[in-house]
């Protein structure tokens, strides 16, 4: 069965559950805003044409809203596409043993440090092997196909590097998987040990000796590191864009919403087929809530040559070294332009093809009857 707004429907049905103190404040705020999206609660713009008035309600811009997330994601893709030079890129995914996932779930302040750790590992490897600087874009990813907590970091790394001494561009940089794994494992374990020493680590087991034994055991394990080569930045950006501004589950994956349960599908990569997952509405909301980032938390972070300040200083040089013309940063598209470009329909044209004109704005919580 297809639902027009399945996530909003689930939020409406479970409001008495998630609108409580036990829900993380960021998720509670985001869920509330998502329910107000495109309603009189947020106000509206009023347009008039030969057919009458058109009321266009404001959007919420919440990270839990699939509609707003799509538009924000497309704008992010356009900006990143313009800022990065053409060429090859590498995608490196840093994972960790599943026994460490609950620790980072219960300590989000430590999870926020993982992108910087991953970037430092990559930069250290490039500096040690080539004496060069690379650009790194890191995205903290906290969920799997079942919406369970699974902390890992996706990174996009420039395929080439800028020599720290000669200022020349090295066209190809290769990484040793084992060296990256050992450096990543060491960095994560040291982060947890440092947090344990200063008393900012909340985890089960809580005893310091038990935690140290757990970390020592993970220090002897092999941690999975995945390295991919992308022919262009577009390949990675489209892949990463799914996790940047959108909710952790696409709406088309939800196949059934009942009075007490919800069913959705996930991909089984080993068997190459869809697997259906059924859980209660409350459990679905709880899983979703743990993946909503803090309101002012950056989901994408840039380091090295991609960091904001170095990028402004070295971007011109990189484009010149690669013989490419630098592109201007694209301006945000108005909502009507976005709809026309993405769906082929101009919402501000009336039935006669004439353009409607703006006549005013409705403040929040104002209801107004419209003929359309």
Annotate the PLM regions.
Residues 1-372:
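Beta->alpha loop/short-helix hinge microenvironment recognizer with preference
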């Amino acid at each position: 069965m297809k639902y027009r707004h399945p996530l909003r429907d689930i939020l409406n049905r479970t409001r008495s559950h998630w609108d409580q103190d036990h829900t993380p404040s960021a998720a509670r705020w985001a869920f509330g805003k998502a329910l107000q999206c495109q309603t009189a609660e947020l106000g509206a713009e009023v347009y008039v044409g030969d057919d009458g008035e058109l009321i266009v309600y404001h959007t919420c811009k919440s990270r839990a809203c699939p509609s707003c997330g799509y538009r924000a994601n497309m704008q992010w893709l356009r900006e990143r596409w313009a800022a990065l030079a053409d060429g090859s890129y590498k995608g490196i995914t840093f994972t960790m043993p599943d026994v460490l996932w609950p620790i980072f779930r219960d300590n989000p302040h430590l999870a926020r440090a993982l992108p910087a750790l991953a970037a430092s590992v990559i930069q250290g490897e490039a500096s040690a092997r080539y004496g060069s600087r690379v650009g790194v874009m890191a995205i903290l990813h906290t969920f799997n196909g079942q919406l369970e907590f699974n902390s890992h970091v996706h990174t996009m790394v420039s395929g080439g590097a800028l020599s720290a001494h000669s200022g020349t561009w090295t066209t190809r940089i290769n990484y040793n998987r084992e060296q990256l794994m050992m450096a990543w494992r060491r960095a994560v374990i040291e982060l947890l040990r440092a947090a344990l020493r200063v008393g900012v680590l909340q985890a089960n087991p809580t005893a310091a000796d038990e935690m140290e034994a757990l970390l020592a055991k993970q220090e002897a394990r092999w941690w999975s590191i995945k390295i991919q080569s992308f022919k262009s930045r577009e390949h990675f950006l489209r892949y990463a864009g799914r996790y940047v501004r959108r909710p952790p589950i696409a709406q088309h994956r939800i196949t059934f919403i009942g009075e007490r349960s919800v069913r959705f599908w996930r991909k089984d990569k080993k068997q190459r087929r869809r697997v259906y997952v059924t859980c209660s509405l409350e459990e679905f909301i709880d899983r979703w809530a743990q993946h909503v980032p803090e309101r002012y938390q950056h989901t994408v972070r840039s380091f090295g040559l991609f960091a904001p300040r170095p990028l402004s200083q070295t971007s011109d040089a990189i484009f010149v070294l690669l013989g490419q013309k630098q592109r201007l940063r694209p301006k945000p598209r108005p909502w009507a332009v976005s709809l026309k470009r993405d769906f082929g329909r101009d919402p501000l044209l009336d039935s006669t093809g004439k353009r409607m004109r703006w006549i005013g704005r409705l403040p929040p919580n104002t209801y107004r009857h419209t003929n359309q």
